[in-house]
């Protein structure tokens, strides 16, 4: 059953966030990096299902969706098919007219989420190379539009005491919702930014235990609910963005058989009917990518 899709329109980004798979891949394997933006014709040929009322999450794993060269054409085509769009972006380096064109395509069912972790004077401690001036322009245009708007804020040690100030700034700009998004992605690249324990995501302890023991009490994956079918910027299907991460991708059947899951030569219907895909979904607890990223934890 298909409830929606998570689509990485491009792996292009202007930022260099320490915890990002893009940053870490380029630092470790610069000779292997290539910029990709999903082919529009391939994308919509692959999506051979009814998109009316389905949620399409445009959120980058390696890149920021707003940097796809044909971004407006893509979102217009999704809206023409009745999809509900959820756009997640940092929002840097786009003009007022670009944002006005964006919101003219969206409607009241759609959401634009800005990822800004801190105040204008400190959020670039993590969002390296981001630009507050252009972000604020985008926020103000979106805030005045008919679509929903959100500010997503990850607590770090440099900003965990600024949450209420940021919440007030959010209200002042007119963004409708302020979300504190506690991260569990702490490792040698990001430990220097780790906040106090109360500001860390609830999966963190389970992930650390898994790293040392590879044992879990079960998995609770969103993809099993048909909500996270993922399409990569270079045009391949995986069950979710976690399984597209280079640290797990080539351990999965989707990374081992990339051509088999190319959106250029397949449809979502054929991929989901494939025995290998079905076997993967039927044995999620056996896969390292699921064990690490989606451990079953007590709800807080």
Residue ranges and their predicted role:
Residues 1-111, 125-133, 137, 144, ...:
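Conserved alpha-helical substructure of the radical SAM core
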Residues 10, 14, 220, 287, ...:
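Residues immediately within or flanking Cys/His clusters that coordinate Zn2+
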Residues 222-226:
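Short, small/polar residue-rich loop motifs at catalytic or cofactor-binding pockets
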Residues 1-5, 23, 236-300:
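Flexible mid-to-C-terminal extensions adjoining Fe-S/redox cofactors in radical SAM and related proteins
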Residues 212-219, 280-282:
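Short, P/G- and charge-enriched loop/turn segments at secondary-structure junctions
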Residues 4, 8, 51-59, 79-88, ...:
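Conserved C-terminal portion of the radical SAM core fold
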Residues 2, 6, 39-43, 71, ...:
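A structural signal for well-ordered alpha-helical scaffolds and beta->alpha junctions
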Residues 12-14, 23-27, 63-64, 92-94, ...:
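Short, solvent-exposed loop/turn segments at secondary-structure junctions
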